[in-house]
Amino acid sequence: MFRNYIKTAIRNIRRNKLYSVLNVAGLAIGVTCCLLILLYVQDELSYDRFHEKADRIFRVATIIDLKDRHMNFASTAHVQGPMFKDEFPEIENYVRFNYYGSRRVIQYKDRSFTEEKFIWADNSIFEIFSFNLLKGNPESALVEPNTVVITEEMAEKYFGQEDPVGKNLRVHNETLYMVTGVMENIPMNSHFRPDFFASFSTLDLKPTGNPAEDLMSNIDYITFVLLREGTDYKELEGKFMGFVERILKPLLDAYEGEARYELDPLTRIYLHSERQGELEQTGDIAYIYLFSGIGLFILLLACLNFMNLSTARSANRAKEVGLRKVVGAQRRQLIKQFIGESMILTITAFVIALVLVTFTMPLFNSISGKTLTMEYFTKLQFVAGFFCLFVLVSFIGGSYPAFFLSAFRPVEVLQGRLRRGTKSSVLRVALVSLQFTVSIVLIIGTLMVDKQLNFVRNRKLGYNKDHVIALRIRNEETQKKYEAIKTELLRHPNIMSVTASSSLPLGRNSFSAHHAVGKPESELTMLFSQIVDEDFIDTYDIEIVKGRNFSKDFPTDRKEAVIINEAAVRKLGWQDNPLGQQIEVFMSLD
């Protein structure tokens, strides 16, 4: 009997080639889009879950509230890890990262490259994180100063077939770092992927003896802690308040501020963190919800299209249903037949969808910035999900046509008196209306995203970023030769201006407490600042509303002059006349 259902279904599909092609094509395209989105979402949700101790790894975050500024840092001071481990027995170990200025010029013999991901880390990194060393001893690889562990990729890049261990890399043409280990390339689904881990002891950081100042100064270090088994991290967070009260309260009271520390679960950082100073760019859980919704909408649209095409042909198949009922076919047999046809069309569409995913994945990767592969399709969880999706789509896509067609009365059909009930008409209209609604929602959403991207690309930033090339100069010897380099560059006919600054206009700037002279010392204003030369304003085409630019004609400008923006004027309360006012820098948090 089942074989007859299949034969009949295949004959009907062959007899209606155009309808079958349209149905399969629509469903295949919809499933293709849904699968690509599913792969993207699955990859985003998998970040940092490959670490064996992921459920016990937490990042320490610093939150500081002053009267005119809320600071939410992903970083801490360098003393945070050691102090917390000594203070709280729930903390088994810690690891610190210093990533500020992570771009470095690395040299080995005649090979020299500028690397973007050079950071310092404690040796405990290999105990806490699942970064596997292929060469070297994880217990001592980063204990000594001026040692470095590199990835497989970097080992091949600099050393080729040589054994890197024991060799020296020159950093910024100054410091030599001995390679003490080679580790596997860090997986793409890690929220930070350095190529070089240099020993934290190289930085030679020592406490000043004033714990409060140590904790509130230079909040530039990412600190992860490994909690002991069974520790409730929320309870531990509550204990941090006693630590703050005991050590930081006098300093915070002087600035009329508050501070607290929070723990971020490792597996939530990539999608849920909204803190300043992340190791690398993170994702956003809102996009996961958005793309998941889009994927479901597309799949729903494909199913609705499948159902509408099937019901639209109901009149053409009415006589077939009537004849089958006359010769004894029962309704449940007809339902099985139509569901069988739906399953054949669906499985054909799914197979085509898998082929389309294979061919479109490189394009999708280039657009999304991912490195997705078909490997995920071989996992049991995907196979189970794919089968459930197939059954669901087959049933949803074929259920209404099956129940609708099988309900025809044979006498009315054969006598040409087929009447379509009001309920059926209403349902078909509802399906078509829903299909158009989903389509319109997707189109409007696409247009909104496009307009938002155009706004971001074209919004005015307050400075000119076009035709500007930025070069980082870390080497002190090169910095001393800046004026000579500047003079040489300006000789080129295509270079109009050259300037130097401590950071880019929207880069990582110094963050400090400022006091307006003449006001009570308790009134502090937190401001970002950077050091620039007299050509900075002109190079970036920044408009000066009041006053003048820095000038070499005024030697005091180099140490005693500042230019502030309109936002700083409002914060300092100088709306009437900011020119000639004086400010002092108190506490620095960078």
Predicted regions and their residues:
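Residue-level signal for the membrane-embedded core of alpha-helical transmembrane segments
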Residues: 32-35, 294, 298-301, 351, ...
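Membrane-proximal extracellular/periplasmic loop immediately following the first transmembrane helix
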Residues: 37-103, 212, 216-224, 237-238, ...
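Glycine-rich loop motifs involved in handling phospho/adenylate chemistry
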Residues: 25-29, 139-143, 552-557
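Generic structural signal for small/hydrophobic residues in well-ordered secondary structure
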Residues: 13-16, 23, 44, 60, ...
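N-terminal membrane-entry
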Residues: 279-298, 380-381, 385
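Mid-to-C-terminal secondary-structure elements
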Residues: 122-135, 146-283, 484-590
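Alpha-helical transmembrane segments of integral membrane proteins
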Residues: 1-21, 278-280, 310-351, 358-479, ...
